[in-house]
């Protein structure tokens, strides 16, 4: 019998238990952990919400553990966590960062009215050109499962080197697992136009993982009226831990508060977008 894989000290599941009608599910990115969403999770918990940020399968331990997982496994982890919250609460809101945003889109579409609102951070419908090309080519490699772990050229995409160094995340990535992220990109893109969930799209202008054009692509694909976009001019990919973290947390909490209160939607000049007064979201710096 194999010993259980060790869990990174700061990378464990985060949960703040509360009663009430609503709960929030926070989903982290590929090779990362719930740690990157802690500022958001803690702030939402202070609003009296039950908040769960699960450690997705294969994460928060050793890169070798991730090698045995794929998009379908991370999706299964997200479904399990959502349904656990939905068993205890009427509505579940989803906050997803990076791969977690892709998971959130699919989950919100699948669970329909049980999902009260969706916050998408750094949504990687397409990665940077080089990485996207490498992953597409990797999918065609024979025996990709036996391919060795690939060293990351850079650490977590956050502007403060000190923050990046303190983040619990893998410094190597299994190529087959990373390549399966394309399945998530395709699944999310297919469902965006069919979503009926109020959605807030947040993105850093200097995102090196998922270029900022992803945010506008998401907004353009969404067809429901209640959608909002905020671009943070100084931030990179890991929004909740970057230099505009306070704004990211404030905007996320304000959006969820507004949707929970079912505030009216006020149309903007752009027919594809609307903003709720309480959130005051716009496609500018916060």
Question: Where in the sequence are the language-model features?
Answer:
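The serine-hydrolase catalytic nucleophile loop
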Residues: 31-41
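Short beta-strand/loop motif that positions the catalytic acidic residue
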Residues: 195, 201-203, 207
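Gly/Ala-rich beta-loop-alpha elbow adjacent to hydrolase catalytic centers
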Residues: 96-100, 104
């Amino acid at each position: 019998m194999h010993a259980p894989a060790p869990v990174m000290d700061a990378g464990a599941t985060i949960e703040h238990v509360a009663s009430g009608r609503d709960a929030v599910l926070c989903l982290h990115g590929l090779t990362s952990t719930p740690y990157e969403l802690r500022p958001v999770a803690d702030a939402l918990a202070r609003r009296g919400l039950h908040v769960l940020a699960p450690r997705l399968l294969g994460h928060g331990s050793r890169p070798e553990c991730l090698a045995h997982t794929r998009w379908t496994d991370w999706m299964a982890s997200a479904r399990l966590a959502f349904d656990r919250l939905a068993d205890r609460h009427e509505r579940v809101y989803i906050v997803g960062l990076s791969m977690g945003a892709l998971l959130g889109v699919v989950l919100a579409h699948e669970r329909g009215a049980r999902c009260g609102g969706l916050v998408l951070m750094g949504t990687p419908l397409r990665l940077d050109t080089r990485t996207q090309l490498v992953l597409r080519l990797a999918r065609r490699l024979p025996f990709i499962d036996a391919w060795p772990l690939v060293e990351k050229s850079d650490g977590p995409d956050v502007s403060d080197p000190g923050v990046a160094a303190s983040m619990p995340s893998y410094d190597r990535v299994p190529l087959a697992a990373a390549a399966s992220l394309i399945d998530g990109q395709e699944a999310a893109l297919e469902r965006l136009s069919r979503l009926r969930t109020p959605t807030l799209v947040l993105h850093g202008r200097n995102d090196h993982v998922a270029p900022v054009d992803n945010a506008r692509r998401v907004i353009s694909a969404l067809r429901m009226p209640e959608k909002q976009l905020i671009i943070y001019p100084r931030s990179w990919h890991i929004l909740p831990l970057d230099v505009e973290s306070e704004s990211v947390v404030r905007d996320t909490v304000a959006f969820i508060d507004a949707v929970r209160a079912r505030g009216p939607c006020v149309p903007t000049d752009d027919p594809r977008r609307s903003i709720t007064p309480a959130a005051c979201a716009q496609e500018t710096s916060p």
